[in-house]
Amino acid sequence: MVCGEDMEGNLTKGPILKTLTKLAIPIMASSFLGTLYNLTDMAWIGLLGSKAVAGVGVGGMYTWLSQGLASMARMGGQVQVAQCIGKGNRDEANKYAQTAVQLATLMGLVYAAIVLLFLHRLIGFFHLDDAEAIAAALSYTRIACGLIVFSFLTFTLTGIYTAQGDSKTPFIANLIGLVINMILDPVLILGPGPLPELGVAGAAIATVTAQGIVMSVMIIGIFVQKKDNVLKGIRLFARIPMEYVSGICKIGIPTALQGMAYCVISMVLARMVSVFGAEAVAVQRVGGQIESLSWNTADGFAAALNVFVGQNYGANKMDRVKKGYRASLWTVGIWGLIITAIFVFVPKPIARIFFHEATAIEIAVDYLIIVGLSEAFMCVELMTVGALSGLGKTHLCSVISIIFTGARIPLAILLCRTALGLNGIWCAVSSTSIVKGIIFVATFFWITRSSRILKDNSRL
């Protein structure tokens, strides 16, 4: 229950695999719920046709971009809070938590204002040539990004809860939000009976309503929990202390740059994909959501490992850090291989769930097979980024990720001009994911073999 969660969240003691799994399972379940959020939207929107899906796909790029920005407050706050708890300094943890929430609120409001101000130019970037798709993109983005502050706060509160070893409260909140979203989607999108059919606007309204409810549940959880919570007593409208902003930015800015760069690169690729028609854009959007069965799960496990590493690093227990990483490597790697097998061997039944036009199904099948080959590597990459970030090595993660993700653009330009055509873009994405997975794993083992990691920690 929300009110009964143990907020002590000490991850520096006890059996490693059991401790890590206990924290990871609710996070992974929450990630699955996030996937179901998006898949539910896409399944209902798919009934409106590929043009509506393409429009939502374009609008979704800007909600995705916002997550990169939001990760500054979330990752910076999560890592700093976890390390403070590992050191036994809960007062500092409280101050970092308050600052993270304040930054999330401010950035969410500013981002919404910018998107609304430049909405037509932002949608025009993708050069959609269909009036219906453009209208859908404008309608969805106006609502989804206009109230994006709910998402920013939910994202950051989840990180702070997780940093304390409480992954159950965010799971319960997300479960409630999913139920609300699943109820509202068909009602608002299709307008059964006397209700008006709102189409893609209905999908956006359902999403932001669910996000607002998730945020509210987590806020309520702060006050009803019996154990200590570093979020208790925070003052949203107090002066933002710059010394804690600096600590959060030191960890969070590289992560934010990495996330936003990844999204911008994906936008460029989406623009290249748009040359092949609305069906191709729709497949990229829906394909990414289907693929989130692996990356959302890996990202959830990465969040658990991030906190585990952060607390144990703060307590100078590097042996637990290494053992926790190895256990996670096996777990996430096997999951990625399972997803690869599903995508490669049964792509058509999956594609038919979301598409009803022959051309779109054919494109989706190719996407799933090609991208599916890299799923295990992508899962391992995301998990390792979580571990390295827990050590405070977000700068290194950012550099590696931006360089090799950025390589997708020239590689895609080269390959799509060959006989591969559209599949050349999918090949560029898949091949770079494989390379990143290998490099990140090698980097983690290289970093943790060095005695410098403990010297760095002693100066924190």
Protein language model regions, located:
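Short alpha-helical transmembrane segments in multi-pass integral membrane proteins
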Residues: 1-24, 81-149, 195-253, 309-374, ...
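Residue-level signal for short hydrophobic patches within transmembrane helices
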Residues: 13, 17-36, 40, 62-69, ...
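Helix-terminus/linker motif at the lipid-water interface of multi-pass membrane proteins
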Residues: 32, 36-54, 123-131, 187-198, ...
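Small-residue hotspots at the loop-to-helix junctions and early N-terminal turns
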Residues: 50-61, 137, 141, 204, ...
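Hydrophobic transmembrane alpha-helices of multi-pass small-molecule transporters
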Residues: 65-68, 112, 181-186, 215-219, ...
